[in-house]
Amino acid sequence: MASSSASATVAVDKATSDLLLGPDWTTNMEICDSVNSLHWQAKDVVKAVKKRLQHKSSRVQLLALTLLETLVKNCGDYLHHQVAEKNILGEMVKIVKKKADMQVRDKILVMVDSWQQAFGGPEGKYPQYYWAYDELRRSGVEFPRRSPDASPIITPPVSHPPLRQPQGGYGVPPAGYGVHQAGYGVPQAGYGIPQAGYGVPQAGYGIPQVGYGMPSGSSRRLDEAMATEVEGLSLSSIESMRDVMDLLGDMLQAVDPSDREAVKDEVIVDLVERCRSNQKKLMQMLTSTGDDELLGRGLDLNDSLQILLAKHDAIASGSPLPVQASGSPLSVQASKPADSSPKSSEAKDSSSIAGSSSPIPATVSTGKSPIDEEYEEEEDEFAQLARRHSKPPASVTTDPTSLESHNAASNALALALPDPPPPVNTTKEQDMIDLLSITLCTPSTPPAPSSQPSPPPPAGSDQNTHIYPQPQPRFDSYVAPWAQQQQPQQPQAQQGYSQHQQHQQQQGYSQPQHSQQQQGYSQLQQPQPQQGYSQSQPQAQVQMQPSTRPQNPYEYPPPPWASTSANAYYTPRANASASYTDTSALAGRSLQQSNSFPTRAGDPQATSTASNSGVSVGQKPFVPSYRLFEDLDVFGSADGKHNKPANSSNGSQNLSGSQTQQSMIGGRKMI
């Protein structure tokens, strides 16, 4: 018994739930079937309904009254007795006297008036119904007028049994209901499970009831059972449904799509429920109509309802809004804002592309609601694809400094940088060769003859003179600083060598050897490589300046630190007929010493090479960098290991000069 009471309470609570927007007819009819099958459940059901009538919510009270009315109309005398005994009528009177919700109050007055009349008034079987009516009437309550087409509470019995199975649905008062028949109401085993022949009127059953005995597990729903009671499809019904839909569409257009609480407004909730109900009715009407025009309009209205309800569900769930069909009737309202969507999308695209090249704000005010903006975002990709040929080409600037140049486009040419000069294909070794080859230049004017004796040149020295012509004249005017004599001269090498030559002109060569070595060697070693290495082109300009001092083409003056040995600085013209095989090694060594910064004074090989080295300087020969400083004697030791007799030195000098020139011209050094 306890389990049956609990199941009855759960069923009543479900049928009268506060979450329902309207009566749950399926649950109500299941409760009626349960009471008709098990009479002793009527007590538990009535008790649960009375408890729901005492609820504070007017919605729950209204649903409980609807369930009670359904039970009274579809159940027998045992339920009528429980309603009179459990003082449900007294509870209904209290609700009316408390001036509760007007809808609940009117519902109670209609039910009490119809019940007292159906049960025979004060002389009837259950006078409790009349007493409740009389109490309300004496308290000054005016009952509403009775409807002439209202269904009776107790349907009178039929005069003859039907010959066929009656067609009908729930809600139709059963014929002859209330007449107790033999075997009626006997509990059946396994109730709730469809049984063979259950619900089908049997021979001798007596008075058949329309739709009575439907099991709870049946797939036939209430909305399908009441399809025959739905009114036919007409233009007026379609227009009324469309008015409700348009009103809901206007309200959804005004709310924020991102605000879920906005759709919980009472008016919006009521309109949504009416639209859902209208959609169900419309589908039922479409199945029964034969007019093509009405069918087309009905299908169009159904599509619009479907789109509108999907939009409401999307806002309520916070999901993205669905894309509307362009031809749907609902999209007519947003047609004007949608016309400007291509322009706004173009403005968004152009502003996003030019965002890196222009500080202009990219916000475009179109005056549309957030819902229209959502639709535009959905259509942007297709709109851009359709307008890809008509959109102007957008210039994308990747330079971050072009923000200012965009505003000053007229001054763009003034800010353009000039083209860089063409690179000079020079290597570090080539620059060093140009610097050190200055000492190999031969003067064109003969210097003053030396007072010291010198051996005559070897025989055959003039035979090969024509083989080594003087190079370009631009290199014949320069004399190495340490090769200059003590005669006063004009300042030479003003760019790069003025400091060294002025110092030599002031002090001359009369100073002791040690002081001259300190002054000349230190200044020669430091300024010349730095200035000549970094600026090789000014050296050619310096060499073109003529010298006014007479020079001897057959000899060089001794350097300041040179020794006083005879024939140490006198060198004949380097044209010897010696063999190349004997002095090939000396020629390589003389080239190293000629290209070094300080050269030993007693080494005739270094000075012999300077006479005919102009050709190699003009053609800029290639010398490996690892051979430039191979024989450099930094400390200037005078041990004499490089000093050789004059005759041999002359031959080696001639050979080394010629061989060095040939080896440099050939691009490599012969050893």
From Swiss-Prot:
GO cellular component: cytoplasm; early endosome; early endosome membrane; multivesicular body
Keywords, alphabetical: Acetylation, Cytoplasm, Endosome, Membrane, Phosphoprotein, Protein transport, Transport
Superkingdom field: Eukaryota
InterPro entries tied to this protein: ENTH_VHS, GAT_dom, GAT_sf, TOL_plant, VHS_dom
Low complexity compositional bias, start-end: 334-362, 407-417, 483-554, 647-663
Disordered: annotated segments: 320-620, 636-671
Full protein name: TOM1-like protein 6
GO molecular function terms noted in the UniProt entry: phosphatidylinositol binding; ubiquitin binding
Ranges annotated as biased composition (Acidic residues): 372-382
Residue stretches of biased makeup (Polar residues): 395-405, 562-598, 605-616
Function, as annotated: Acts as a gatekeeper for degradative protein sorting to the vacuole. Plays a role in recognition of ubiquitinated PIN2 auxin carrier at the plasma membrane and further to its endocytic sorting. Binds ubiquitin in vitro. Might contribute to the loading of the ESCRT machinery.
Lineage: Eukaryota, Viridiplantae, Streptophyta, Embryophyta, Tracheophyta
Biased segments, Pro residues type: 444-459
GO terms for biological process, alphabetical: protein transport to vacuole involved in ubiquitin-dependent protein catabolic process via the multivesicular body sorting pathway
Domain VHS residues, every copy: 15-144
Domain GAT: 229-317
Main location: other
Any Pfam family: GAT
Organ and tissue specificity: Ubiquitously expressed.
Membrane topology value: Peripheral membrane protein
Family per record: Belongs to the TOM1 family.
Subcellular location: Endosome, Multivesicular body; Cytoplasm; Early endosome membrane
Positions carrying N-acetylalanine: 2
Chain positions with Phosphoserine modification: 147, 596
